[in-house]
Amino acid sequence: MRQIAIYGKGGIGKSTTTQNLTAALGESGKKIMIVGCDPKADSTRLILGGLTQKTVMDTLREEGEDIDLEDILKPGFSGIKCVESGGPEPGVGCAGRGIITSINMLESLGAYESDLDYVFYDVLGDVVCGGFAMPIREGKAQEIYIVASGELMALYAANNIAKGIQKYAKSGGTRLGGIICNSRQVDYEHELLEAFAKELGSQLIYFVPRDNIVQRAEINKKAVIEFEPECGQANEYRALAKSIDENKMFVIPKPMHTDRLEELMMEHGVLG
């Protein structure tokens, strides 16, 4: 069983990418569980056809500790098992704690004991704070992929996440599997992302082009592969899934200084 965490800045398309990627893996016959690690609890809605899933934290609050796996785990497209960790009520407590509680709960209920090929953790945002670092800090996820684009703030966030991976890699055994570009159609984006990944000592594992069908599928509460399986974008997600399934390059990243990051962007005509 491979345990993979997907990180990236807020709004980069991390949850969309994760769900379309897992739909492609599921279609190919892989057994998958997605654990949504975002208080918004939107990591599984395309797999579940728009079903707003009750989160682990809400279930615990309403029903106490005596819960069954079926209460928090729902099957969706291609039999993909879906869990949303959720978080505390707004303004109260640390959302990262929800991730810790959820993973511990899933372990105690035997969720990891089935014949899974993959567990994906879709993790909130720009910071790798204590709670959100849980999947890598505790060595739950052995592989990390960072979703980025050719925009400055996306690369700042990716570089910060690389710092977090570097910090925990030595103790937890986690490695960076690569950068996934979710294209924003920025000039020289492909070249910039390849250079950025190389600078980290990693690879651009896949460049996902921008296509409006992704939004159309989202409005219809489906992954692209379910919504329009024969379209070009569905094949892009299949190719991304194949790249990750066959990946053999796992590194401790070498994050760069901010000055070097800005220099890299100037070299590729993004700044200046």
UniProtKB/Swiss-Prot annotation:
Positions of modified residues (ADP-ribosylarginine): R97
An annotated Gene Ontology molecular function: metal ion binding
Cofactors named for this entry: [4Fe-4S] cluster
Binding site for ATP: G8, K9, G10, G11, I12, G13, K14, S15
Binding locations of [4Fe-4S] cluster: C94, C129
EC number(s) given by UniProt: 1.18.6.1
Keywords: 4Fe-4S, ADP-ribosylation, ATP-binding, Iron, Iron-sulfur, Metal-binding, Nitrogen fixation, Nucleotide-binding, Oxidoreductase
EC top class, as a word: oxidoreductase
Co-factor binding comment: Binds 1 [4Fe-4S] cluster per dimer.
GO biological process, one term: nitrogen fixation
Record PTM text: The reversible ADP-ribosylation of Arg-97 inactivates the nitrogenase reductase and regulates nitrogenase activity.
Keyword Hydrolase attached: no
Pfam families: Fer4_NifH
Lineage: superkingdom: Bacteria
Catalytic reactions on record: N2 + 8 reduced [2Fe-2S]-[ferredoxin] + 16 ATP + 16 H2O = H2 + 8 oxidized [2Fe-2S]-[ferredoxin] + 2 NH4(+) + 16 ADP + 16 phosphate + 6 H(+)
InterPro entries named in the record: NifH/chlL_CS, NifH/frxC, Nitrogenase_Fe_NifH, P-loop_NTPase
HAMAP family per UniProt: NifH
Subunit relationships: Homodimer.
Protein function: The key enzymatic reactions in nitrogen fixation are catalyzed by the nitrogenase complex, which has 2 components: the iron protein and the molybdenum-iron protein.
Family according to the record: Belongs to the NifH/BchL/ChlL family.
Protein name per Swiss-Prot or TrEMBL: Nitrogenase iron protein
Gene symbol of the encoding locus: nifH
